[in-house]
Structures are given as C-alpha cells and as structure tokens.
C-alpha cells in the first residue's frame, strides 16, 4: 500500500498546493489521520489545516457544535486546525445575511478556540455587500470572491428525471 509520501514524491513534486476535502466531521478526519505520518514528514510550517464552516448546515449550526466538531477533527486526524474559513451559504438562496451570521458565529468560535479566521468566501455580489459593512478584518481574513458559472435549476432538473 502506498502512502501520501509515495504519491507526493512521484506526482506532486512540482505542486505548490494539495487540497484534501475530508468532509468536516470525525469520519473524514479519521480518513485524513491515515496520512498523519506522511504529513509529519513535510517541512515544518508547510501544512495548513482549515475548517471550512457553513453555519447553515445542521452539524455546524451553533458555536458549541462547531467547537465540538473541531475538537473531534483534531483528535481523529491527529492534526491541528490552523485556520477557519467562513463559507456560510444557502447555494442560490444566499443573501448577505448568510455571511453576516457566519461572521458573528465564527468570530465567537475563534475567540474561544484561538483558531484564526483565514478566509471568508462568498458569491462576489454578497461578499462585496458584506465587506462594505465594516466588520472586524481579524474575523474575516482574506476575502475570496466566488463567481458561479454553472447554475442548476433543481426543480427543472428533477422534473427532467421523471419525464
């Protein structure tokens, strides 16, 4: 069986960034933990572990749930979360309130846990509104504007399946 080290050495030597999406829960963190030894072989400071948070998802709907999930993720992955990303959204139904609400909750999580907010992501128009409101940049991090290129009309798509 090959570890991440083998993959990294053979294929990723010229990559600056490799992203693992572990799903944000204990199950995904356990799968990520399988590569713990490989991660420890990386240059110190080169590994960043982000918790991407959408407070509109049931498992991350309260400060307490987010803190609990972060604790579990760190235990099962055997990695320290180095930053949080506010990615609060409701897909096409997202408005400025989503980023505002995410900001308020993630700010509390950061103050309690000491884990910094590294990024805030959102659809460009919603992010622009949010950023114009004068929130504390310490709990926004670097803004990442998302432009949506593929729009899915779920009702039409589902109807098409039943035809």
Where are these regions (language model features)?
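Short, small-residue-biased leader/transition segments that mark boundaries at the very start
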Residues: 1-8
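Generic structural signal for residues positioned in beta-strands
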Residues: 7, 83, 119, 142-145
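Loop/turn-to-beta-strand initiation segments
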Residues: 14-18, 48
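Walker B catalytic acidic pair
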Residues: 22
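Conserved catalytic-core segment of NTP-binding enzymes
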Residues: 26-138, 153
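N-terminal regions of ATP-driven nucleic-acid and macromolecular assemblies
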Residues: 130-163
């Amino acid at each position: 069986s090959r570890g991440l080290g083998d993959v990294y050495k053979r294929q990723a030597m010229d990559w600056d960034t490799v992203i693992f999406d572990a799903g944000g829960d204990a199950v995904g963190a356990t799968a990520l933990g399988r590569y713990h030894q490989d991660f420890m072989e990386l240059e110190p400071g080169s590994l960043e572990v982000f918790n991407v948070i959408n407070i509109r998802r049931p498992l991350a709907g309260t400060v307490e749930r987010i803190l609990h999930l972060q604790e579990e993720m760190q235990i099962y992955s055997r990695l320290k979360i180095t930053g949080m990303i506010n990615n609060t959204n409701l897909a096409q139904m997202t408005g400025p309130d989503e980023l505002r609400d995410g900001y308020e909750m993630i700010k509390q999580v950061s103050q309690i846990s000491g884990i910094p907010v590294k990024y805030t992501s959102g659809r460009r128009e919603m992010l622009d509104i949010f950023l114009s409101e004068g929130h504390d940049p310490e709990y926004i991090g670097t803004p990442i504007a998302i432009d949506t290129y593929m729009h899915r009309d779920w009702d039409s798509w589902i109807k098409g399946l039943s035809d």
